[in-house]
């Protein structure tokens, strides 16, 4: 719901916890993935993986990816981790100078004997861009084949985090970018700024950007020819794109293309500047560069397709059948995505409940609306992609069943968005239910600035923390939304709307129990609780019935929010008992705005104020 705000909160939060040692060059390590299979004696070339933004080598998804690659290739697998721990690694994805990070990784690769004879490389999201940078600049990085999944090779023209339809978020981000993106400090410390590119300020981009302009040969520099020659040393460069990528903008960047920033039209790789400047034309003519497109969103692909890529480009000795072939054939659509074992287990629980008829039956895979797209040549499809024909057949549905055109859809965007068919009253009503958190947010702001009660500010602060937790969990699990929703954006687990309502319900009920315990069992209180839970039911149901989320994402979102809400009531109470709130009220800014903390300490506050007002009017009339 607050994807843009969450990104900014995470950015600022990183600086609050940033230790002084982080101003030095971070320590970068290569973590070797070890399994109980022939991992050391094999002559198979190893694979090096560089993860994407907000991820770590030990996350659920990356762990499964690494283990899967190792089982398929029967060789060693290394994962690049930046920093001393997982938090440092996540932070390094946002903050740091890329040239320094790449130099350190290059040195470590050079010191790793098992990589001296060459290796394969797999880059997820921005990790693919960094691996290509290694291939072009690091002599020790003898990469044979490089696969990049959703990597912004041509750059990005906005910070990741805004949905395509969230106009307010986009306006805020573009304003921030316009004010400071070209500043030397930003260019040397913010990772995404170092591959930010816009043709609307192309002169400033060429003048101030020192990473992407050199990497893509958009300016003349000392290593211009070397960049081209080093790319030619690759046996294969495979750029995988996702048709509905909602993280990389423009999404065509993942296939070495761009977008006409005036008309919005796609600029194909062959018509873009990199085709000549980076020598991509020669790679295409030599059969070394392949661009592949999948129909999902960012990093959404079937395990069978992923396995096929690994076997085709990373396997030294081709085998007719692998030990994973049977296990990767999908039984339902959910299990085929790039998801973690934990989320798969959650989905399995819901499958069990569906089998017990406790929930409505899930939609069949063949009912999901996916666009047909050829990703390999016909002669290769049977051999390399054994499940493609099944996938295409399942996705070849009538256009009439798909979403209506953008002109026939109405939408509202206030920190969030929803779509509905104008002639469908049911979906319109459900869409309005999705706006309940926004309405509550407006009420928060209104009460804060009219009542000026510290308790309201603390509750609102808890919602901000709740949103941050939602963002961290989403980027860690990377669980997708339903594939048949055209405009749902970002990852889906857990639902932020449901988590918001879970926090709101828990906080309001627990607050009553803590500060109004003598009244919390009255009929009036039960009526209030029923309203909170009814509103929560409306919101959660709308997110599921409108196909913005799977049922698991809604249920777990509400549970997480409810838990955070209970904890936040306890935490605020603890701060009061320790005198922290009293200290806060003594601060000059809070005194200037007359912030007070009276609600928890006075019962029937509204009735008392009403009586005082009535008494004052009577005295004035007399």
Curated annotation (Swiss-Prot):
GO terms for biological process: membrane lipid biosynthetic process; protein N-linked glycosylation. Changing residue 245 to A: Sensitive to vanadate and elevation of external pH. SUPFAM superfamilies: Acid phosphatase/Vanadium-dependent haloperoxidase (SSF48317), alpha/beta-Hydrolases (SSF53474). Residues 427-428, 512-519, 574-622 are cytoplasmic. It comes from Schizosaccharomyces pombe (strain 972 / ATCC 24843). It catalyses: S-hexadecanoyl-L-cysteinyl-[protein] + H2O = L-cysteinyl-[protein] + hexadecanoate + H(+); a di-trans,poly-cis-dolichyl diphosphate + H2O = a di-trans,poly-cis-dolichyl phosphate + phosphate + H(+). In the N-terminal section; belongs to the palmitoyl-protein thioesterase family. In the C-terminal section; belongs to the dolichyldiphosphatase family. Essential protein. Removes thioester-linked fatty acyl groups such as palmitate from modified cysteine residues in proteins or peptides during vacuolar degradation. Required for efficient N-glycosylation. Necessary for maintaining optimal levels of dolichol-linked oligosaccharides. One of its GO terms (cellular component) is endoplasmic reticulum membrane. The chain crosses the membrane at residues 406-426, 429-449, 489-511, 520-540, 553-573. This is Palmitoyl-protein thioesterase-dolichyl pyrophosphate phosphatase fusion 1. It is found in: Vacuole; Endoplasmic reticulum membrane. Disruption phenotype: Cells show lethality and the dolichyldiphosphatase domain alone can rescue the lethal phenotype, but the growth rate of these cells is slower than in wild-type cells. Cells containing wild-type palmitoyl-protein thioesterase (PPT) and inactivated dolichyldiphosphatase reverse the growth retardation phenotype. Cells containing no functional copy of palmitoyl-protein thioesterase are viable, but abnormally sensitive to sodium orthovanadate and elevated external pH.
